[in-house]
A protein has these predicted regions:
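Short, solvent-exposed cationic patches
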Residues: 39-61, 162-168
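Hydrophobic alpha-helical segments, especially N-terminal targeting/anchoring helices
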Residues: 2, 17-18, 142
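Single conserved hydrophobic/aromatic residue that forms the stacking wall/gate
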Residues: 1-10
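Basic, glycine-rich polyanion-binding accessory segments appended to enzymes
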Residues: 59-148, 153-168
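Short loop/turn microsegments at loop-to-beta-strand junctions
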Residues: 11-13, 137
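Active-site-adjacent loop/helix segments that line or gate small-molecule/cofactor pockets in enzymes
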Residues: 27-46, 100-111
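Short beta-strand/strand-turn micro-motif
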Residues: 17-32, 50-56, 110, 133-134, ...
Length: 168
């Protein structure tokens, strides 16, 4: 798919596959699933599985495949993110590089991060790997109880990349 076609095909149903590429079900359209999602995958109760829950670990946009794996695998974790359009309540970042805390999900405890600004965006390195940080969601930055600002997540740096069969 080219970019425009990719936008359309993410709405189309397709195969749900495990990390080996084995088809284990069908999905309703990639746009309806997020990294780390466990519910609503339509693959529970598989006899061949380990009995652990299935989680979304990636999306193969080129082939319209939803990639899932059982259990808490490294593919669910990332070490950093990029946010290209951060906004700060004060009007500007506190410094070119600074330490603060961040939240990536509603009601999540604060997580220690180092923010390195580049233009209106930043690379945000996590103190420890974080589970299911997802492009399209927001990162919100804090100094104690004070909200510094935030913005949409554009990319994440995975702790362990998906196998090459999903990225070439």
């Amino acid at each position: 798919c080219d970019r425009r076609q990719r936008q359309m095909c993410i709405r189309d149903s397709g195969d749900t596959v495990d990390l080996s590429g084995r088809v284990i079900g069908k999905h309703d359209g990639l746009m309806y699933y997020t990294l780390g999602q466990r519910r609503g995958l339509g693959i529970g109760g598989m006899n061949e599985g380990t009995g652990e829950s299935w989680f979304v670990v990636g999306k193969d946009l080129k082939r319209n495949r939803l990639v899932v794996q059982q259990g808490e695998h490294e593919e669910l974790f990332s070490t950093a993110l990029t946010a290209e359009k951060l906004s700060f309540i004060s009007g500007c970042a506190p410094a070119k590089q600074f330490r603060c805390t961040a939240k990536f999900r509603y009601r999540q405890p604060d997580r220690g991060v180092t923010v390195t600004m580049h233009g209106d965006g930043a690379t945000i390195d996590f103190d420890s790997p974080e589970r299911a940080v997802t492009p399209g969601q927001w990162v919100v930055l804090y100094d104690g109880d004070v909200c510094l600002g935030g913005g949409p997540i554009d990319e994440v740096a995975p702790l362990k990349a998906l196998p090459k069969i999903f990225t070439d």
